[in-house]
């Protein structure tokens, strides 16, 4: 590879905003590599990372409070452009000699910003033109404090009626601050603003593309594992599937995939995984039929957390047994992605908020002698999907709705039985089939069916029946942290209900879940 795709890089310092990962995803979309670190990173770490620009995120705290987060002084001494977003702008102003005050009017939600002075950051960006000829921007605000006095050397470049310094910059040092959130879609020109910062102000090149990421990953896999054998637990989910395709392209037959059919998958899913990866793509894949083992292990267990643990532990046991049969295996591959590994490891003081502390290895023995290969470790989910398309995986598979790790184990309420799983599989398949037929599948964020272990009276022909109940669940959400129930058409719901009751012997009633998150969770267990 002639160009190192990591050479052009932006550093994002996290001050605790719920939108921080979104900033990183936007920078990646622009085509530039970036990393997300805790706000209290050391000077040495910044020097070693050697960014071409730094972005300071928003955050929930107040700059005016003692002990609130601050950017390292070196951020403003490194000689690279800096963009402060919301709290990031406030701490920039405070640290460089300006003033920040609590505002008598808190701004949350839509606002219109007036551009009052030209700058490289807001150049040629407008949503409308005001009566005075000034550019107006539709933006998303989320702040209580505001910059009351800008630091020496800065100029105000935008304002709102209640926020006189909605954006500021220091032309000489190329420091910029915006009180709004350019990373969210509600800020209509936010992507253009970030692009102008990353490409025009920081002078980055667009090296971070799907094709380049694949080429880089393949080179690194080859360099790491050489001619040695790699094992991968293939689930058929997005992350493990893309990992499998990357490894297959890099090392071919030296990859062995182990697919564990635990009896908790969707209708025909196990056969589809084998057909796609074994027959179509030619991967070396071992199928383990472990339905009986898993169902035996789950007998008598009703508590959702105990079910999850039982399923996870049994999977590790089955996988370890299969791995031990493979001679000369030196490496274990996993589909760990970037949000899994973002944590407070970069926190020098221990004060930084943990975004997420997680590792995909959970449950593997500590004395495991296999080395670890994680080719997706730097990637966000949307990037994984893009390179999956580039590698030839089908769109419908990459953009399927989320499916929980324990599978139907948490969609059958209470104790798991084969009868319940078989009924649920068929009902869920009808629901999903009808969503596709009505062109509704991609319009909802997640849809599935839940088996309720209660019987209900019904009538079929002239006969009374006393059978099981299922619930349909469909939600709309951006981040899965909050969700609204999807307002699917009544005629559609009626059709799905009629098909399930008429086609599946054993189900007498279908209900629709109209709970939002909060207070309910998306999954029932």
From Swiss-Prot:
ATP binds at residues 235-241. Keywords: ATP-binding, Glutamine amidotransferase, GMP biosynthesis, Ligase, Nucleotide-binding, Purine biosynthesis. The active site is at 86 (nucleophile), 181, 183. It catalyses: XMP + L-glutamine + ATP + H2O = GMP + L-glutamate + AMP + diphosphate + 2 H(+). Its EC number is 6.3.5.2. Pfam families: GATase, GMP_synt_C, NAD_synthase. Signal peptide: none annotated. One of its GO terms (cellular component) is cytosol. It comes from the Bacteria. Residues 9-207 form the Glutamine amidotransferase type-1 domain. SUPFAM superfamilies: Adenine nucleotide alpha hydrolases-like, Class I glutamine amidotransferase-like, GMP synthetase C-terminal dimerisation domain. Coiled coil: none annotated. InterPro entries: Class_I_gatase-like, GATASE, GMP_synth_C, GMP_synth_GATase, GMP_synthase, GMPS_ATP_PPase_dom, NAD/GMP_synthase, Rossmann-like_a/b/a_fold. Pathway: Purine metabolism; GMP biosynthesis; GMP from XMP (L-Gln route): step 1/1. Residues 208-400 form the GMPS ATP-PPase domain. One of its GO terms (molecular function) is GMP synthase activity. Homodimer. Catalyzes the synthesis of GMP from XMP. HAMAP family: GMP_synthase (MF_00344). This is GMP synthase [glutamine-hydrolyzing]. It comes from Alteromonas mediterranea (strain DSM 17117 / CIP 110805 / LMG 28347 / Deep ecotype). The lineage of its organism: Bacteria, Pseudomonadati, Pseudomonadota, Gammaproteobacteria, Alteromonadales.
